[in-house]
Amino acid sequence: MTKLLAYFPSPPQGVWHLGPVPIRAYALFIIAGIVAALLIGDRRWEARGGERGVIYDIALWTVPFGLVGGRLYHLATDWRTYWGPGGAGFGAAVRIWDGGLGIWGAVALGAVGAWIGCRRHGIPLPAFADALAPGIILAQAIGRLGNYFNQELYGRETTLPWGLEIFYRRDPSGYIDPHSLDGVSTGQVALVVQPTFLYELLWNLLIFVALLYADRRLTLGHGRLFALYVAGYCVGRFCVELLRDDTATHIAGIRINSFTSTFVFIGAVVYLMAAPKGREDPESLRGNQYVEEEPAEPEPATVAATTEAATEGVAAPADGAEAAGADATAQRPEESAEPDVEKPESEETEAAEEASEPEAEEPEAPEAEEPEEPETEEPEADSGEEPEEESGEAPEQLVAEEPEPAPQQPETKRRWGARLRERLSGR
């Protein structure tokens, strides 16, 4: 009874078949961990000032690179299993769904993919890593459940009350082996071991909570939160490696992952101390896509239409004035030298008009005489103008007499002046 309450068993199998398609627990937990990391990372990225959805775009680079890097690290540190005497061969080396991912390779090559994605979006890689750090450690915790279903990465034999029972499994060919990934448990216990997968799972959950707390209290940025995650994970991984008893590469009697954890921990601590304090400017997290789209916002169709309408309203009086000036010039050549039609009474304009009239009065002399004949009050002015124009007398005498001899000119000026004022008032 005490044994049943103390030890906990391994799952009876780690793979199920949906027809010809195998459904592996290890792959399901890896996918679940990736989804959880992306969901948490996206929310954290938006909370820091970034644009929502960018995490998923960069994940298209990060996840494939991370999976390949994790597999390469596993093959490099456990090469005898595949290419040593009696090794599984190249076919087993590429079957990533059978298990075997090294977190250090996944983080290293995944960082390369993240750098490519961040560069394409114009956002800083350290800020992206800070937003994703808690999600990564949570994904690692979820992924350890896949090791539990595969009966792998366990520790040395133990008599502790929380020991893990490893069962013999029979594969479809009838071969019985506790390491069979496709087999089903026979119910016979092969050994009781340290549940190192559980130790690392609990440690990762503790780091996950610690990262969230530190990020809120200390406002870590510029990659410092990610460095804290790496340093914290290295401590736990170093301790777990001391308890593991599975096949691994050793250097001077020490597992290679222990060396890796030590060096990576030192690098993380150095970066944590050297990186800038505080957080990035939220505007720097928007990326180049947001900046490129921003100038288009203040130029909607309504603003353009309003600008055009205002331009037309201002240009209409000017156009009307230009058209009026053109018509008047075509009809009266002598008025081409009159720039201001609204001020016929000013002395300066009258002097300018009189100066220009002698040059253009010869063709219009009869026109000025026709309307003057029925008028009884202006014969003297007409007769006085003719000798003045012909003899070229001084313009002083014409200043006072100019409005009277040609009644058509002031009428035309008033007409165009009134029309111009109406258009300007309509503006």
From Swiss-Prot:
Q: Does the keyword Cell membrane apply?
A: yes
Q: Name one GO biological process term.
A: lipoprotein biosynthetic process
**What does the record say about its membrane topology?**
Multi-pass membrane protein
UniProtKB keywords:
Cell membrane, Membrane, Transferase, Transmembrane, Transmembrane helix
Localization annotation = Cell membrane
List, alphabetically, the InterPro entries matched.
Answer: Lgt (IPR001640)
Residues engaged in binding a 1,2-diacyl-sn-glycero-3-phospho-(1'-sn-glycerol)? 144
Sequence ranges of Low complexity compositional bias: 299-330
Q: Where is this region: Disordered?
A: 280-427
Please state the Enzyme Commission number of this protein.
2.5.1.145
Bias category Acidic residues: which stretches? 347-404
User: Which residues fall in a compositionally biased region of kind Basic and acidic residues?
Assistant: 332-346, 411-427
GO MF annotation, one: phosphatidylglycerol-prolipoprotein diacylglyceryl transferase activity
> Where, by residue number, does the polypeptide cross the bilayer?
21-41, 53-73, 96-116, 122-142, 189-209, 256-276
Keyword set includes Membrane: yes
Q: What is this protein called?
A: Phosphatidylglycerol--prolipoprotein diacylglyceryl transferase
Where does this protein come from, organism-wise?
Mycolicibacterium paratuberculosis (strain ATCC BAA-968 / K-10) (Mycobacterium paratuberculosis)
